[in-house]
């Protein structure tokens, strides 16, 4: 029983270890995957149509979504950092927008 409990704890902890490996001491996400042509086109479309991603550098789901886009496409996105201690933090904007969870996507009105 003790061995089973240890295995379960290791399995539960592993995803957070993997996700945290993409975080650096500079308080920003580090996207490492390569983008596809389609993901770059999608990111440009989202940017051009006023879609904004509210994110936090420590958020595992934010990282997972960013990795799906890849590093080239990620640079095209409109991303607002909501964590107070994040690089280029816009915490007050996140508070004003009533962002409660991460990631949150919003289509800005023109």
Residue positions per predicted region:
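Transition segment at domain starts
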Residues: 25-38
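Local sequence-structure signature of Cys/Sec-based thiol-disulfide redox active-site neighborhoods
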Residues: 35-76
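Bacterial N-terminal signal peptides
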Residues: 8-15
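Boundary at the C-terminal end of the N-terminal hydrophobic targeting segment
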Residues: 18-20
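Positively charged n-region of N-terminal signal peptides that target proteins for export
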Residues: 1-4
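Thioredoxin-like thiol-disulfide oxidoreductase module
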Residues: 66-70, 78-102, 106-108
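Short, intrinsically disordered/low-complexity patches at protein termini
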Residues: 15, 77-78
